[in-house]
Amino acid sequence: MRFEGERVVLAFGALEDPTQVDELEFLLERPIEAEIAPAGRVAELLKRHRGGEVLLEQASEGLRLQFVDDDEEDVDLKTLPAESPIVRLVDSLVLGAIDRRASDIHVETKDREVVAKYRIDGVLYPAIEPLDKRHNETIISRLKVMSELDIAEKRVPQDGRFRLRVKGRTIDFRVSIMPSVHGEDAVIRVLDKEQLNEAFRRLRLDVLGFTESDLVKLRKYITEPYGMVVVTGPTGSGKTTTLYAGLSEIATPEDKIITIEDPVEYQIPGIVQVPVNEKKGLTFARGLRSILRHDPDKIMVGEVRDPETAQIAVQSALTGHLVFTTVHANNVFDVIGRFIHMGVEPYNFVSALNCVMAQRLVRVLCEHCKRPDTNTQDLLRESGLDPELYQDQVFHEPVGCEECGGSGFLGRTAVAEMLDMSD
C-alpha cells in the first residue's frame, strides 16, 4: 500500500469481488487504485509485516524449544520466564529458520531498531518487521543463555552453541556474538545434521549441477590411485559438499579414507573423520602428519591454510596417496599461485595435481511458480550472447509462491570451471 496524493494504491493477490474496493473507499474516505500483484509476494509481505505479532501468537500456543546436551539428554535452561514475549520471539525465530530452510539467522542492531534476517539459498531475507532497539539487550541475552555464554560480557566477541530436538530430529546451532557501534550483533548457523546426513548418504556428483564433460573428467580423477584434486571457491560455495560427494562415490571397504576437517559438520559412513582442535594443538598440519601414519589410501584435507599443510599435502600426493582438498582462490589459475606463494615448488605441485575445480552456487527458479519470460533480448546482449542463437530457447523468470516463500527461487546448483592437467 502507498499514498499518491489523495489516492491510496493497494496491491491485491486477486480481486474476485470488485465491490471490496468500493467498501474500502467508503471506510478510508479516499479514492483507491487497485493493482494486481503476484499472490505469493502479497502473502509474503503480509507475513513479514505482521511478523513479530504472528510469531508471538504462534509461540504462545504451547510452542517451546526442547534443548538437549551432547548426550541427547534433555536440558532445562534457567532463563527468562517462559511466557516472556522476547523468549517466545527468539524461540519462534529459531523454529521459523528451520521451517524456511535458512542456513543462518542474523540479528543486527541498528541506530534505532533491531533487524532479524534469514539467509536462504545464499540471500538474506527479513525474518520479521524491525523491532525497537530497546529489545536488543534482552534478545542477545536470551541467545547467550541458550548457548551458555557470559551475559555480562558485552565488549568482546563470544562463540557458543546449543542443540535442539525438533520434530524428532536433533539440530545443532553455532552462535557468534560480536559487539558493534550500536550494540551487540548475533549470527546463528543452523546445522541440521540428521537431515543432511541422510541426504549425504544419497549424495552423488551428478546431482550437483556439473556439466557432463566436467563430470566425466572429475570422476576420472577421483578414481586415480594417487594425485591431488583441489576445489576452490568463496566461503559457502559448496566446496566441501563437492568433496563429500566425490568421497561418497569412491568409498569402498577395500580403501581406507581419512579426513581432517574444521569442523566435521556432516558424517559419512565408512570414512574416518578427524576434527581440527587448535586449542589442543591439533592443526591441519599436525593432523595430516598423524593421518599418514595410519596407512590411508585416500585423504581429504578440509582446507590448505598454511605452508606446512600445503607442503605435506603435495608430498602425500607424490608418494602414492590420493589427496582431496580446498583452497580459497578466485579461479582455477589462482590456485597454482596460492600454492607457489606458500612455498611449494612449482614442479612438485604440477606433478602432484590431477585437476582443479572452481565453483560457485547460483539460485534455481522455483519449479512451482516460474513462468516463461519473453523479454530476454536485452539481457542476452548485455551478457555478450547473440539473441539469434537462442530464438528457440525458452527462458523463465521468478514469480513467487508459498513453496518458495515468495522469493521465486528454491534451492541452488553449482556452476563450475575445471583445469584439467592432462590437457
Model-derived regions: residue spans:
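Short, basic, glycine/proline-bearing loop/turn elements
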Residues: R7-V8, D71-E72, D76-T79, L203-R204, ...
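Short glycine/Trp-rich loop-beta-loop segment that forms part of the substrate-binding cleft
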Residues: V9-L55, L208-L215
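Charged, low-hydrophobicity low-complexity segments
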Residues: A39-S92, R100, D185, L191
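Ordered, soluble secondary-structure elements with a strong preference for glycine-centered loop motifs
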Residues: A11-P18, D22, I32-I36, L80-V87, ...
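Short, compositionally biased low-complexity segments
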Residues: E16, Q20-V21, A59-V68, V114-K117
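Long, low-complexity, intrinsically disordered polar/charged segments
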Residues: M1-V8, V68-D70, V75, L292-D297, ...
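Polyanionic, low-complexity intrinsically disordered segments
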Residues: M1-R30, R48, D71-E73, Q158-M178
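Short, flexible helix-loop junctions that flank or precede catalytic/ligand sites
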Residues: E83-G96, R100-D423
